[in-house]
From Swiss-Prot:
This is Zinc import ATP-binding protein ZnuC. The keyword Ion transport applies. Part of the ABC transporter complex ZnuABC involved in zinc import. Responsible for energy coupling to the transport system. Residues 6-221 form the ABC transporter domain. One of its GO terms (biological process) is response to zinc ion. ATP binds at residues 38-45. It comes from the Bacteria. It is a peripheral membrane protein. Its EC number is 7.2.2.20. SMART domains: AAA (SM00382).
Length: 264
């Protein structure tokens, strides 16, 4: 098995006296896609900051492969409407990038036609592809994608997930993908990690649903997607603490708990 690109061991973070992350164990290897899901306040943004080296944990370790090249795709980009910034000028903010390199990256994500467009004038789907192209310009060994389908319609989401899979296959980079409440998860995702300040559960996503309506909606892309049904045998209160009186209306489901879980 390939050596991990990044490995988090017993990572804990406290902000303003409140525990945000507790005993997090996580690793991403070359060619592996890890999808991180969880509700608002689960600590996903904090975890991404720790992975990127922007935040030092209060305890635990974040190990990175020496000289690891990371490409980061933010959830969204706010650009002042009065700022004269074209897609090309935006991409050239990455050191060493010229028009040829920018054009090549845009072609790789299927957005070459917008190279001279004002950044403020492109669609949500085009913006996500431009942000992905920018991440690729760093020739990353690890791609960190923060809600890459933000602001994209359902059909566009399928296309973007398919694109991310192809990029992983082509570059053999590791991918850490973050979602707020992801129902559509790629069938090629190697691991799904459910976070709510600690790792609630982790494992492989379920196989693609054969529901005719689902197949009809996604067409040829349907087979590259799966529906991940997110179930717990425990519940959290409003502060993220585990409570034992989880609803029992749904049948039990088997899943793997993280090492940090203090419940069965």
């Amino acid at each position: 098995m390939a050596e991990a690109l990044i490995r988090l061991e017993q990572v804990a973070v406290t902000l303003s006296g409140q525990s945000v992350l507790d005993n997090i164990q996580l690793s991403v290897r070359p060619g592996e896609i890890v999808t991180l899901i969880g509700p608002n306040g689960a600590g996903k943004t904090t975890l991404v900051r720790a992975v990127l080296g922007l935040l030092k944990p209060d305890s635990g370790t974040v190990w990175r492969k020496p000289k690891l090249r990371v490409g980061y795709m933010p959830q969204k980009l706010h650009v002042d409407q009065t700022l004269p910034l074209s897609v090309l000028r935006f991409l050239r903010l990455v050191p060493g990038v010229d028009r040829v390199a920018a054009q090549s990256a845009l072609e790789e994500v299927g957005a070459e036609k917008v190279i001279d467009s004002p950044l403020q004038g492109i669609s949500g789907g085009e913006m996500q592809r431009v942000l992905l192209a920018r991440a690729l310009l760093r020739k990353p060994e690890l791609l960190v994608l923060d809600e890459p389908v933000q602001g994209v319609d359902v059909a566009g989401q399928a296309e973007l997930y398919s694109l991310i899979t192809r990029l992983r296959d082509r570059h053999q980079c590791g991918v850490l993908m973050v979602s707020h409440d992801l129902h559509l998860v790629m069938s090629t995702t190697d691991q799904v990690v459910c976070l709510n300040r600690h790792v609630c559960c982790s494992g492989h996503p379920e196989q693609v649903s054969h529901d005719p309506a689902f197949v009809e909606l996604f067409g040829k892309n349907a087979q590259s997607l799966a529906i991940y049904h997110h179930h717990h045998d425990h519940a959290h209160d409003l502060h993220g603490a585990v409570v034992n009186d989880a609803p029992t209306a749904s049948p039990p489901h088997t899943h793997v708990h993280g090492d940090s879980c203090k419940h069965g």
